[in-house]
Amino acid sequence: MVPLSRDLIVLVVDDNVGMRSIMTAVLRALGFGSIRLADDAIEAQKVILHVKPDLIITDLKMPVMDGVTFVRNLRADESHPFSEVPIIVATGHTEEKHVRACLEAGVDQFLAKPITGRALAERITHALAPDREFIRTATYNGPRRPLGRTYPHSELD
């Protein structure tokens, strides 16, 4: 596993304040000390101009610009310094069409809500792996026994 580091900067993009709070708490519990927040993709694009995140965790369905468009914009220009930043989508929209759209846009990992700390840690580890291009995965952590604390969809969407 890739060690999780306090030195890494994580940008969380979600229009739900409750979800941003939960993600912040989980990331801090995992050892991340530098967490930036954006309440939509437009704000995230502004944050990225000032802070180069090592990892982006974004929601899929947001007002103004959805997560897929946000990722496509980041990945569009390969010469852009942020085109290779690892990206995880965390969403309650787990239908195959959403997973496929995310992966085609360039998302590194897909995390279905409700999230667990363990599932998030696994996705982060894979997203930050040096050979992440070869291990891009889309997994569904839906109807099975949770491996840690879970958060109900009502708190997240």
Where are these regions (language model features)?
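Receiver (REC) domain active-site loop signature in two-component systems and cognate sites
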Residues: 62
